[in-house]
Amino acid sequence: MRIMGLDVGSKTVGVAISDPLGWTAQGVETIQIDENRKQFGYDRVKELVLEYEVEKVVVGLPKNMNNTIGPRAESSKIYAEVLEARIGLPVVLWDERLTTSAAERTLIEADVSRKKRKEVIDKLAAVMILQSYLDTTN
């Protein structure tokens, strides 16, 4: 059973997919979105769901450090609700505190250039969200 992980931001959605056994997460792509124009990349996510035969989607929920829900987390919750209605699959919200920071740290330690980091950080954050989910549920 393949599971998709999403790191939803205001400009991009990082996408990761699990292996067929649900043990490891791999980055797939970063989808460009535009909240101001109401372009959220749902169609591309649906294409990837079909292509990879995904059975469940995990959306990162960026809670505040004190466990409260801020504006970014509210946006992620709405994204998850709309996505679930559009694709007809279960969508799970998963605490993703500090995943983008951890992803950036990993890329800096790997000596990845700033330009390249910007291109891959959301995809890596999606991998971290999905891998955390897989590690906890397997």
UniProtKB/Swiss-Prot annotation:
One biological process term in Gene Ontology: rRNA 5'-end processing
Presence of keyword Nuclease: yes
Intracellular or extracellular location(s): Cytoplasm
Domain of life: Bacteria
EC number(s) per entry: 3.1.-.-
CDD domains: YqgF (cd16964)
Keywords on record: Cytoplasm, Hydrolase, Nuclease, Ribosome biogenesis
GO molecular function: nuclease activity
Residue ranges that the Swiss-Prot or TrEMBL entry lists as coiled coil: none
Cysteine pairings via disulfide bonds: none
InterPro entries for this protein: RNaseH-like_sf (IPR012337), YqgF (IPR005227), YqgF/RNaseH-like_dom (IPR006641), YqgF/RNaseH-like_dom_sf (IPR037027)
Entry-linked Pfam families: RuvX
SMART domains attached to this UniProt entry: YqgFc (SM00732)
Keyword Disulfide bond recorded: no
EC main group: hydrolase
Cellular-component GO terms for this entry: cytoplasm
Chain's role: Could be a nuclease involved in processing of the 5'-end of pre-16S rRNA.
Family per record: Belongs to the YqgF nuclease family.
Protein name from the UniProt record: Putative pre-16S rRNA nuclease
